Amino acid sequence: MPVTIDPRRHSAALFDLDAVVTDTPLDSTVTLVRQLQGIGVGTAVFSTNRNSQGVLTATGLDHLFPVHVDGLASGKVTILVAAANRLMAQPGRCVVVAVDAAGITAARYGGFALVLGLVIGEDQTGHRDTLRNSGADTVVADLGEVIVRTGDRRMSELPDALQTLGLTDDLTARQPAVFFDFDGTLSDIVDDPDSARPVPGATEALQKLATHCPVAILSGRDLADVIKRIGVPGIWYSGSHGFESTAPDGTHHQNDAAEATIPILEQAATQLRDQLGPIPGVMVEHKRFGVAVHYRNVARDRVNEVAVAVRTAGQRNALRVTTGREVIELRPDIDWDKGKTLHWVIDRLHHAGTQVGSASLMPICLGDDITDEDAFDAVRHTDVGGIPIVVRHTEDGNRATAALFTLDSPMHVSEFTERLARQLSDTQR
């Protein structure tokens, strides 16, 4: 399966010196580093036993790596974290490229986002197995196998939807179908997830909008939880990132392939509660199709400990690990996400017959988090094209996004929703 370095999810890439300087020069490694720098992903070299600066200078590669960290006395975890810190990146947003079991293990136990094993030498089969067994997410023989996602823009570069997005002409030709995330989009992010509520005016705006066009909520929360918090009838609700949904008529749907993981997730939740319970501020949220571990209230020097525990549980239980705003989550390892859920809802709207015809839907998607990027991709790649809007924040830095427009806060989402409902009312008179 191809592996992708994605600037929406990854802020930096840390390379073992032995992955960069080899007996046989690897042009693909240099090409990869230049691609990463071209999209704003920082690069660093780490080594436990060599003068990396001298080696890079001697090989003419020093200009590719502004950061290099050596440490004869330090463990590899310490070196990796130091390299991430010098690039001003959190380990949970870093890729590590390592060539041996020690490097892979250190990256896994450092809580790094993506751990790539690079096979060097003759015994590729045995080496691959060693790297995989040490915890590598993917093992490659050449870094030319790594895909670099391009074409996204940084959140700060996007125009504000309230100021620049004019929909009047589109509304006469195409009917919107509007998809909303909940936390960070309709609700402010709060220290206690259980206290999250829609911002003032959001529920009323959703009710107005739903009288004029299809509306859907795509949330990572449990389905029953998000329905209770919003409480607007006659709209679509999808919980657990789309693994479970209800239609406006109350019909229940779920991803049957994920049902077998329900007891596995329950077991993982119990294990994580026991393991992480002594860490002040951690919250383990068990959902029907997921386990979310919130660390917003955890001391910064213990966040990596939380991430390591969750990633280890994911590998142990064959579950997918995803991240979000101060949360790391386990879910079924199935090819399903908010983007596929969005397509699934649109297909059902087409089959049901919309007011202006199945070819004329205009999907609009609003979200703030990494998991919403799958829906943004889906909106942009629908046959008719749509409008992805990211709700801006700084918790992931000025990260890249597939969105085309931005809004500054959930209050602005409420205002945008109210304005869209009003425009539709005027158009449909």
Curated annotation (Swiss-Prot):
UniProt: substrate binding residues: 181-183
The protein's Enzyme Commission number: 3.1.3.12
A Pfam short name: Trehalose_PPase
Keyword line: Hydrolase, Magnesium, Metal-binding
Chain positions recorded as Mg(2+) binding sites: 181, 183, 368
Cofactor(s), names only, from the UniProt record: Mg(2+)
Biological process terms in GO annotation: trehalose biosynthetic process
Pathway, per record: Glycan biosynthesis; trehalose biosynthesis
GO molecular function, one term: metal ion binding
Family recorded in the similarity comment: Belongs to the trehalose phosphatase family.
Protein's name in the database: Trehalose-phosphate phosphatase
